[in-house]
C-alpha cells in the first residue's frame, strides 16, 4: 500500500527532465519569445516536461504544438536536436511543481527553424514577440535559455 501511495504522489509532480526549443526564422533570424502566465515578467522559448513514455524529441514536437500550435513531423528537418543538455537549478518559486528535495532539472536543447514569422496560437502564455537573438537574451530570466540562444544563434549566417 505504501508503494502505491508513493507512486501516486510522484505522478502528481513534474519530471525533472525537460526540453527547451528555440524557434527562429529563416528569413529574419529573429527569435520567438513567450510571456509566461504564472510569471508575467518571465519571457522564454518553448519549454516542457518530458513525459515518462517520451523521448526528448517527441516532447519537443508535442510542446511546439501545445504552446504555439506549430505542427512539426517526426522527420522534419526544421527541428534540430542540439545533442546538448544542461542541468540547472529550478527557480525557488517553481519548485512546488516538483517532488520534495528536487532542486535541479536536466534540460535538452533543440532549435526549430521556420520559414517566416507567424502568429502563434497561445494556450499557455500571455503574449509573444519576435525579436533579435540579442534582445531575446536580454529578455529572458532563464540563464540556460540565454546560453542556448547565444551558442546557436548569435553567429548564424545565411
Swiss-Prot record:
UniProt GO molecular function: dATP diphosphatase activity; dihydroneopterin triphosphate pyrophosphohydrolase activity; metal ion binding
- EC id: 3.6.1.67
Q: Which residues does the annotation say bind substrate?
A: 14, 36, 47, 88-91, 142
Required co-factor? Mg(2+)
The molecule here is called Dihydroneopterin triphosphate diphosphatase
Write down the PROSITE patterns for this protein, in alphabetical order: NUDIX, NUDIX_BOX
Kindly state which reaction or reactions the protein catalyses: 7,8-dihydroneopterin 3'-triphosphate + H2O = 7,8-dihydroneopterin 3'-phosphate + diphosphate + H(+)
Short motif (Nudix box): ranges? 48-69
The function of this protein is:
Catalyzes the hydrolysis of dihydroneopterin triphosphate to dihydroneopterin monophosphate and pyrophosphate. Required for efficient folate biosynthesis. Can also hydrolyze nucleoside triphosphates with a preference for dATP.
Tree of life domain: Bacteria
Record's cofactor remark: Binds 1 Mg(2+) ion per subunit.
